[in-house]
Amino acid sequence: MRSNWRQMPLNEITELVIDHRGRTPKKLGGCWSDSGYRTLSAKNVKNGQIVQSDTIRFVDEDLYRKWMKEEIKRGDILITSEAPFGQLYYWDSDEKIVLGQRLFGLRIKDKYDARFIYYYMMTREFQEELKGRATGTTVIGLRQPELMKCSIRCPDITTQHRIASVFKAIDAKILINENINDNL
């Protein structure tokens, strides 16, 4: 089945890479706020979920505009570059957020199903390639050029939509079960 899937580097299917790593309020002439736009970092992305919500910081409108020249949009894929490494999140919201420390945003070209690409990036095959391209001994990290060389395998767009739809339904069921367990 996968033998007829097309293999290509991630950069071939990516429209935009949003990489504002290293930016801080101080470097941009601002400060953290008590409210406003959430600033996600690598520590907030784990196993396809936003975690440690209590550690999320905020910036005001002015700092948001300075920081996020390219905004995260619904359908973008967030991926951590280090600490933790290779964690993914599919952004399925219209909320405007700031990409903070050690986090890339990927916008997939329209002729591909971004949700399918997200699920593909969660596969053992893709994660192993990420590990093979990583650098560092104490803290393992991934540079953007190496990420963009990683191979993606894609079937035709109709099959991408079908596969993504099945995994989305499974994720929704998992979330329902987790909520039920939390309320027991």
Where is each model-derived feature located?
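Short glycine-enriched loops at secondary-structure junctions
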Residues: 45-46, 83-85, 135-136
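A generic secondary-structure signal marking the coil-to-beta-strand transition
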Residues: 6, 35-38, 55, 102
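Residues marking the start of alpha-helices
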Residues: 1, 28, 55, 63, ...
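Sequence-specific dsDNA recognition surfaces
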Residues: 7-30, 43-74
